[in-house]
Amino acid sequence: MKLVLVSGRSGSGKSVLLRMLEDLGYYCVDNLPLPMMGTLLEQLTGNSELVAISVDIRNMPEKDTELEKHLTNLPKGVELLSFFLNSSDEVLLKRYNETRRLHPLSHSNISLKEAIQLEGRQLEPLAKIVDHYIDTSNLNIYDLNDQVREILLGNIDKELMIKFESFGFKHGMPTEADFMFDVRFLPNPHWEPELRPMTGLDKPVQDFLNQRPLVNKFIWQIENLLRTWLPDLERNNRSYLTIAIGCTGGQHRSVYVTERLAEHFKDGRHKVTTSHRELKNAKD
């Protein structure tokens, strides 16, 4: 089991980092008291190989020796990697003033600035023993994501899951699509009596459409468009991309184009899935 421990000063980006780890497939637990960590890991053994836990000042042990004891006495087979996020007092003060959130150490007789400074002093022992110390004062969420991915995976390229979906406009447009392309202008196999009962998954329909230069040109241009912008979409911390292809009934043209595009993107760099809404609905 690989365990990532996320700690740091409040407002430095711990929750953001935890969401990034969740996108990478980690089972994430926020603000877990350290004495409960061993029990949690034992419960997850065999079920989750990637686990991430965040801790904050409110559930940290008071003694440094107790802290190190929790981090060294882990169940057998657990590989620990720890992060500490920090930001300057000025940046943290600005972030809290902008969000108007309450600092964990704020109370009636202490100011926000004093709470930020107090937390910094109390977390110093932990900051000295972590594997990776990251100052987020001048980082945005994308910069932080790149740093963490490089540490965990050895690269900053994000594996994007791409879903190609066919549909019929007469049955309504899908609401979850990031890109939508209308192929109703392409030659329609529906008007060929022998092809009408078939779908874009059948070879006669595929041969009919593959012989049309307009169809191949359209597929080529859509592929180029997507490949041009995929790197920027990946850098934008996106996990999923849904591309919808629509024709009139969702039986022939959209199905064929969806399959062709999916085939072109199954190059090992991306997880690609296909879905044919109207064909599925017909079966149901």
From Swiss-Prot:
Q: Indicate whether Cytoplasm appears among the record's keywords.
A: no
Which UniProt keyword terms apply here? ATP-binding, GTP-binding, Nucleotide-binding
Matches recorded under Pfam families: PapZ_C, RapZ-like_N
Q: Name one GO molecular function term.
A: GTP binding
Stored InterPro entries: P-loop_NTPase (IPR027417), RapZ-like (IPR005337), RapZ-like_N (IPR053930), RapZ_C (IPR053931)
Amino-acid positions noted as binding GTP in the UniProt annotation, renumbered to this chain: D56, I57, R58, N59
List positions binding ATP.
G8, R9, S10, G11, S12, G13, K14, S15
Listed Gene3D superfamilies = P-loop containing nucleotide triphosphate hydrolases (3.40.50.300)
What top-level branch of life does the organism fall under? Bacteria
Q: Hey, which family's this protein in?
A: Belongs to the RapZ-like family.
Q: Which NCBIfam families match?
A: PRK05416.1
Q: What does this protein do?
A: Displays ATPase and GTPase activities.
Protein name as it appears in the record: Nucleotide-binding protein swp_0674
Q: Write down the species.
A: Shewanella piezotolerans (strain WP3 / JCM 13877)
